[in-house]
Amino acid sequence: MKKTFYHYMMKHRAALFSNEISNLAEAMYDDLSFPKQSEDYDEISSYLELSGMLESMSIFDEAWDLYIQDR
């Protein structure tokens, strides 16, 4: 069974050492409108761009690459 991107990112919450990916995971957790069931890069990328959640989309790209490697 595939994990959604949201589910994958939740393992990065409350990291011992805070970093950009753990901060993104916390922001996703706090955002009740985040598309939690999505596995689609374009849908999640568009959502993050429109929400202004990130200063740089390269943070999402890095997290997405880790997600794809883990699948």
UniProtKB/Swiss-Prot annotation:
Family: Belongs to the UPF0346 family.
InterPro entries in UniProt: UPF0346, YozE_SAM-like, YozE_SAM-like_sf
Signal peptide: none
HAMAP family: UPF0346 (MF_01538)
Pfam families (UniProt xref): YozE_SAM_like
NCBIfam families (UniProt xref): PRK13672.1
Name of the protein: UPF0346 protein BA_2302/GBAA_2302/BAS2147
